[in-house]
């Protein structure tokens, strides 16, 4: 069984789109009928995230950690108890392509690290995507770690102790421990998971803060150009 874990804290605006994309990926013919279970960790949610999950018949559980690392770890533990042999991780504001799970299994490695892109639905988000694409590394061997596009075998996950209860960087921490333990890691340039362009995220120091930092850097560079007359 493949287990898909999704941490969520007040994600009513995006969780439906995320789960529908996961359900489509779970039906991909490349999985050859392998069972897929999706679990959403409702971490201190006060909006309608839980109701949307129920409408889509997706399993959930509640916790009050307010910590993305703890939420991922709890969801992973739940899936392992249910017999998962592979754990796939994404974020509640992400959208996965149909071949996402099949590609992770096809990699035939202990861990799968994929890339992400930023959704562009308006002028601001298109600008953010351009900034992100300038800074991101693409293609196989990229060396990036994103919790929104991550997979690991149950055996390798257990061997290194799983996700740590970190408020940020739990994905990077896990992959570092996997690499140190000699696990094989597939740094895949495809498939790409699309994530939101929001600048106010759920975890301090997370992806939204990274995007906000890119915006500030660009604004600072523009200001310098104006002052020096080089822009």
Located regions from the model:
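Conserved donor nucleotide-binding strand/loop of the catalytic core
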Residues: 50-82
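A conserved acidic beta->alpha catalytic loop
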Residues: 39-50, 94
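Acidic donor-binding/catalytic loop of UDP-sugar-dependent glycosyltransferases
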Residues: 48, 90-106
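Short beta-strand-to-loop element that shapes/binds the nucleotide-sugar donor at the catalytic cleft/hinge
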Residues: 112-126
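Acidic donor-binding loop at a coil-to-helix junction in glycosyltransferase catalytic cores
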Residues: 168-174
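A recurrent flexible, glycine/aromatic-enriched loop bordering the glycosyltransferase active site
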Residues: 119, 134-152
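Short, well-formed alpha-helical segments that are part of the catalytic scaffolds
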Residues: 11-28
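Short beta-strand/loop segment that forms part of the nucleotide-sugar
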Residues: 30-44, 61-63
